[in-house]
Curated annotation (Swiss-Prot):
The keyword Zinc applies. A zinc finger (C3H1-type) spans 7-36. The keyword NAD does not apply. Its main location: cytoplasm. This is PAN2-PAN3 deadenylation complex subunit PAN3. Keywords: ATP-binding, Coiled coil, Cytoplasm, Metal-binding, mRNA processing, Nucleotide-binding, Zinc, Zinc-finger. GO terms for cellular component: P-body; PAN complex. One of its GO terms (molecular function) is ATP binding.
Length: 620
């Protein structure tokens, strides 16, 4: 390409037009490199368009004559006069009035001193001058005042165990509680989708407690620790008192009754507190049988702990403390009236036999102590847990009816009166079984003579009918329940074996926790971050303790062929178990930069881990 040097000197270099500079300016470029601005050429220069400024703009940007800012305690209206010299139009700026706020008469009427001018059609040069107005009054947003809620509307009763219940509509600071996430790992698939493993293969579900059992236990813990505001802070020796059942007026006792749970200050355990409202006791006579009830031990009876009177609820009340069984429901809620958020469990003859056997066992234990179950033999006073029923209101009738009991004892004598009460217990058991049979088959209609038309076996019908006529529970058990007791014992032993097998899976979990704790105690300690200290302690790449860092990466920081993190729980458990056993299996450790490869055994890593941990614990 031939270039005329004379004409090229007057032609602007295209590199200047395109890039803003020419790197061949001082290296033989024949074109002109003169620009209309004073921007320096070179690799760090910016395009001419972006750096081009006018003398006026530079003067406005840095003005040495601008007065220094000094805070003033004068009112805001005086600031307009103070800074009037900076902008000649500061007094002409219109006052900002927020939309939706009605203008007051003082704002709508122009004043003589500072008359508000209509906003002219502005240009771009006028925008910076009207951006800030020191005389603008403070902005007060207009918000409608919410109307107070009507006083005559009553709020519906709140269930303390209903999760995700909405809070008050006007309360924006209290959020509804979310349910706990019980599936800490993926639940086991249904049997039809389960993958068949060989005899030597295991998965994560076989290494932990059963998912359903774990979820049940976690729900019980959640119910035990759940609190609810509004109750009294302290009731006798119990704190964190939370209502769990509001019964209103009891159909059995004819008094107002409710159930709470509270934590004892004595032993820290949680107990169920049954409260009877407006019940006054002037002496210790009603509590004379409490010690005998407290010493009663039975698998089918809720143990009574204490009984006392209190005014912590606002009125004189009787409180009886029992053992607490979280998430337990009554027979009435389990089979008759559906509980909120629950479902009814269908009754079968096997379940009826199970209930009959356990009821007879509970009543037999009570009668051996020269006591009577009385009002606790009711569908609403018997709680149900897994394959277990328990009498949950023992001793209440002895306290509530103490005056009538004393009068009857004085009339017929204590032995005769107690014998009559025990006979009534046996009749109540038979009546309760008839009620459950009616739930199963409404044809019975709560009539013991219609049991034969219920479709149940003749053995069960005969057992219930004889129960209403017997006077001796011992002979009744030998005649009707001896064979059924073997079925109950077999079921309980199977349940015990299942729980022991689940417990055995969690028995040695502490070993792996100890290993991970030791590794985290040792690796990446801050006092070994210094190179000199790390070299002296043996943590450099050539040191013996460097193997622990590589092993930590080998266990927890594995990646696949695509570079994604590997989160295989089974692999971590297998590796830590091998480390705990200290087997001689060899494996390869690779550094993060893949420049160091070491073949070691689990035994060597375990010995090194124990040695370093002993060094740390000794303070060396």
């Amino acid at each position: 390409m031939n270039i005329n040097l004379d004409s090229a000197k007057g032609t602007l270099c295209k590199n200047i037009l395109i890039y803003g500079y020419c790197k061949y300016e001082n290296k033989g470029c024949a074109f002109s490199h003169r620009r209309n601005n004073n921007a320096n050429s070179g690799p760090g220069a910016t395009p001419a368009k972006s750096v081009a400024t006018t003398p006026t703009s530079d003067k406005r940007k840095f003005n040495v004559n601008t007065p220094s800012f000094q805070p003033s305690t004068a009112p805001v209206q005086g600031l307009a006069n103070k800074f009037a010299g900076l902008s000649p139009k500061v007094k002409d700026i219109p006052v900002f009035v927020p939309s939706g706020t009605p203008a007051s008469p003082a704002q709508s009427t122009p004043s003589t001193g500072n008359q508000e001018q209509p906003m002219p059609t502005s240009t771009v040069s006028n925008v910076p001058e009207r951006k800030f107005n020191t005389s603008t009054p403070s902005f007060t947003p207009s918000q409608p005042i919410p109307a107070p809620p009507p006083q005559n509307t009553s709020s519906p009763p709140t269930n303390p165990y209903l999760m995700n219940q909405p809070g008050p509509p006007t309360d924006m600071y209290y959020q509804s509680a979310y349910p706990l996430q019980y599936h800490l790992y993926a639940p086991a698939p249904p049997p039809r989708l389960a993958i068949t493993h060989s005899s030597h293969q295991v998965d994560a579900h076989s290494l932990f407690i059963d998912s359903e059992l774990r979820e049940t236990l976690q729900k019980r813990n959640e119910a035990t620790l759940q609190s609810y505001p509004g109750g009294p802070e302290i009731v006798d020796v119990y704190h964190t008192v939370v209502p769990i059942a509001a019964e209103g007026v009891s159909k059995i006792w004819k008094v107002s009754s409710s159930v709470y749970k509270g934590v004892s200050n004595v032993d820290g355990n949680v107990y169920a507190l049954r409260k009877i409202e407006d019940f006054k006791i002037i002496n210790e006579t009603p509590f004379r049988t409490i010690k005998r009830w407290h010493g009663l031990q039975s698998a089918n009876i809720v143990k009574i702990q204490d009984a006392f009177t209190t005014v912590a609820f606002g009125s004189p009340s009787l409180v009886v403390a029992y053992d607490y069984y979280p998430n337990a429901s009554t027979l009435l809620e389990q089979h008759v009236n559906r509980r909120l958020g629950g479902r009814l469990e269908p009754l079968t003859e096997d379940i009826l036999w199970l209930y009959l056997t356990q009821l007879v066992n509970a009543v037999r234990t009570v009668h051996k102590k020269k006591l009577a179950a009385r009002s606790s033999l009711d569908l609403s006073k018997i709680i149900v847990t897994t394959n277990r029923i328990r009498l949950a209101a023992i001793g209440m009738s002895d306290i509530l009816n103490w005056e009538a009991d004393d009068a009857e004892i004085a009339r017929v004598g204590l032995p005769t009166y107690m014998e009559n009460l025990q006979q009534e217990d046996i009749r109540n058991m038979a009546r309760l079984m008839v009620d459950l049979t009616t739930v199963m088959n409404p044809v019975v209609q709560n009539d013991i003579f219609k049991l034969k038309s219920s479709g149940l076996s003749t053995d069960f019908v005969a057992a219930v009918q004889d129960l209403s006529n017997t006077d001796d529970l011992e002979s009744y058990i030998r005649k009707h329940l001896a064979i059924r007791l073997l079925d109950v014992v077999d079921m309980l032993e199977d349940s015990n074996d299942y729980l022991e097998s689940q417990l055995s899976t969690e028995l040695e979990n502490a070993r792996l926790v100890r290993l991970m704790t030791k590794i985290n105690f040792i690796v990446d300690r801050p006092e070994w971050d210094n190179e000199a200290t790390a070299a002296a302690a043996g943590w450099t790449e050539n040191g013996p303790k460097y193997l622990l860092k590589l092993f930590r990466d080998f266990v927890f920081f594995q990646t696949d062929e695509m570079g994604k993190p590997v989160t295989d729980l089974s692999r971590v458990l297998v590796t830590l178990n091998k480390l705990d056993a200290g087997i001689d299996e060899k494996f390869l450790l690779v550094s993060r930069d893949e420049k160091t490869c070491i073949v070691v055994s689990y035994k060597e890593i375990r010995d090194l881990l124990e040695s370093v941990f002993r060094t740390i614990t000794r303070g060396k």
